[in-house]
Amino acid sequence: HNVLVRKAEGIETAGSLNILFSDKTGTITKGELEVVDFFTADGTSISANELRHHGKVKGLLDLAIGKNTQAMFDVYHKVIGGNATDQALLKFIGEETFCMLDGNDGCKVSAHQGFNSSNKFSQARIESIGKTFYKGAPERLLAKATKYLDGDGQIKEIDQKALNQKIDSLAAKAMRVLAFGYSEKELVKNQINDDLVIIGLVAIRDDVRPSAKDAIRQVQEAGIQVVMITGDRLETAVAIAKDAGLLKNESDRALSSAQLNQMSDEEVKAILPQIRVIARALPTDKSRMVRLCQEMNLVVGMTGDGVNDSPALKRADVGFAMGSGTEAAKEAGKIVILDDNFSSIKDAIWYGRTIYHNILKFCKFQLVINVTAVVVSAVAPFLGIEEPLKVTHLLFVNLVMDGLGAMMLGNEPALSKYMKEAPRRRD
């Protein structure tokens, strides 16, 4: 079932979960990101085939992607390294373009800062051409940009309102949008320069796993609250959550990290039962949610794959580390989900409940056998039977009957009815 149990108590505790926080990419969605649209900041879409006719835009976009990434093509022509977004972008520009950039000594990266969940952008400085390239969340780049390149490579003023409407419309279709830009100034760590020019934006699609929809439904029927945590913008997260079956009722809440951090602990606790989505989430949000849930006596499950997720995985009652994640995350988690699939998390919960029921059955069996033996041994002498159960009889009962019974009851199959039961609270 693609579930590796690192700590034995993890699987039994999984059956007692009250709330489960799950990452989106690769767990609820397929993790097979694909660039489906490129458009300039005036909203004009340019297909991958047509880009070669827009020389200046293509040249700068290739640099913004190919020289500002952790991914690469291997000798088997497959994209490796980086995250799923890096890999999707590299496939978009193609292996030929990447290899040409990689072998060009005239565009060596002199300084680089990778993407992190706090900044929401990455940047690379190419000193030989005097430009710093940016890749990241549109709201971060657009906050510093006033100009953009049109399809002909001309620099023009941005209509922020129209562009944001375009981004919102794509987000409502469950698409993730990334922006690219360049600056003539030097790279400044954790900062976007104020002379930023937008090269263009891409829409990336990552469809929900069909198996995840059914698994989410089963977990919800088991009385477990499922909350999706993602780095996507709120509109994109809401669209995906609706598709996955997480947002069904008007009372269900979707919050951004910024909204969450504006609320006090008591305010978050008050609306916690209605929360279904946390967008633009930070690793600190995960740790905070685990702490608040445990203060409410809830048994908490948390998924994660990065080094920054380790504190939350360790603090949660059950940390589900992803098989494709870092070793630090796997060490912090009690269970490793080898295929990164939400369906496997559902299986872990199911078998956790099965183990509990099997232990309960064995305890009942033992109680009946031992109480019967005690009653017979205690009552029989009053009926004239001095030694109804000899030592050999008791040894036979304990070693043979109990042993066989334990093996049979301990290996009873998982029953679907277990996923219909209400979870057990910590208290």
Set out the residue ranges of the language-model regions:
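Short, intrinsically disordered, charge-balanced linker/junction segments flanking boundaries
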Residues: R424-D427
